[in-house]
Swiss-Prot record:
One of its GO terms (biological process) is purine nucleotide biosynthetic process. The gene is folD. InterPro entries: Aminoacid_DH-like_N_sf (IPR046346), NAD(P)-bd_dom_sf (IPR036291), THF_DH/CycHdrlase (IPR000672), THF_DH/CycHdrlase_cat_dom (IPR020630), THF_DH/CycHdrlase_CS (IPR020867), THF_DH/CycHdrlase_NAD-bd_dom (IPR020631). This is Bifunctional protein FolD. It catalyses: (6R)-5,10-methylene-5,6,7,8-tetrahydrofolate + NADP(+) = (6R)-5,10-methenyltetrahydrofolate + NADPH; (6R)-5,10-methenyltetrahydrofolate + H2O = (6R)-10-formyltetrahydrofolate + H(+). It comes from Streptococcus gordonii (strain Challis / ATCC 35105 / BCRC 15272 / CH1 / DL1 / V288). The keyword Hydrolase applies. One of its GO terms (cellular component) is cytosol. GO terms for molecular function: methenyltetrahydrofolate cyclohydrolase activity; methylenetetrahydrofolate dehydrogenase (NADP+) activity. NADP(+) binds at residues 165-167, 190. Keywords: Amino-acid biosynthesis, Histidine biosynthesis, Hydrolase, Methionine biosynthesis, Multifunctional enzyme, NADP, One-carbon metabolism, Oxidoreductase, Purine biosynthesis. The keyword Transmembrane helix does not apply. It comes from the Bacteria. Pfam families: THF_DHG_CYH, THF_DHG_CYH_C.
Length: 284
């Protein structure tokens, strides 16, 4: 039976350390990190995520602000607001909650954020730094997973890692971070031939395909470490992952649950990156 990777407990531990670091810097400089989150429209899931981010920022001792904009906000208005925060040195992190309404171009919005304040790590400049082996801002979910590996003593060097899912938010940066730790990485997706066979060779399996219970025990090697990034709802509205937890946990050595696994770590890493952006602003 697999040991559970408790993302909630680890996130709380790291959040406590972050609050201590923030308090020390405030004592020394009289300043605190500032994080602004921009929410356009009334997407219920987005409202929950934004509330969690605000709560986490306040718990870390940050200044936190949420800009709630109506659904009909134009792209020009949104870009203008972002530029206001780009130019304001009191704010060190800018997060725009995705998805945005259909009439707004996500890419144009992400490009508009100052790369130094892009704590999501989605700006092409930050992606390029990650690919070139000089990461500054890293997408928070992969960063959280790497923190889990560190905490639970998961050896990466020389290991075979398979990532299922090729998004810019999780799959691609995850593969890059694993490569940087000298794992041998295979990046796969829904159209990969013989996907189960490929996955079954993995010592470390990261699943971010966005399909409920997609990965069964047929995908998993005995003793593998399994990270489930999925957030799906079943027919009863229950939150489930991309991994069939009950059967995979019988053969994995370590596994993340859904909920309580990767999700809490993502928010904590956003806070950590806001703190680091604040520190860099003090040094510049």
């Amino acid at each position: 039976m697999a040991e559970l990777i408790d993302g909630k407990a680890l996130a709380a531990k790291l959040q406590g350390k972050l609050a201590q670091k923030t308090a020390k810097l405030k004592e020394k400089t009289g300043q605190t990190p500032g994080l602004v989150v921009v929410l356009v429209g009334n997407n219920p899931a987005s409202q929950i995520y934004v509330r969690n981010k605000e709560r986490s920022a306040l718990a870390a001792g940050f200044r936190s602000k949420v800009e709630r904009l109506p659904e009909e906000t134009s792209q020009e208005e949104l870009l203008s607001l972002i530029e206001t925060y780009n130019q304001n040195p009191d704010w060190h992190g800018i997060l725009v909650q995705l998805p945005l309404p259909d009439h707004i171009d996500d890419e144009a919005v992400l490009l508009a954020i100052d790369p130094d304040k892009d704590v999501d790590g989605f700006h092409p400049l930050n992606m390029g730094k990650l690919w070139s082996g000089h990461p500054v801002m890293i997408p928070a979910t992969p960063a959280g997973i790497m923190a889990m590996f560190h905490e639970y003593g998961v050896e990466l060097e020389g290991k075979r890692a398979v990532v299922i899912g090729r998004s810019n938010i999780v799959g691609k940066p995850m593969a890059q971070l694993l490569l940087a730790k000298n794992a041998t990485v295979t990046l796969t997706h829904s159209r990969t031939h013989n996907l189960a066979k490929t996955a079954k060779r993995a010592d470390i399996l990261v699943v971010a395909i966005g399909r409920g219970h997609f990965v069964t025990k047929d995908f998993v090697k005995e003793g593998a470490v399994v990270i489930d990034v999925g957030m799906n709802r079943d027919e009863n509205g229950k939150l489930i992952g991309d991994v069939q937890f009950d059967e995979v946990s019988e053969i994995a050595s370590l596994i993340t649950p859904v909920p309580g696994g990767v999700g809490p770590m993502t928010i904590t890493m956003l806070m950590e990156q806001t703190y680091q952006a604040f520190k860099r602003s003090l040094e510049s």
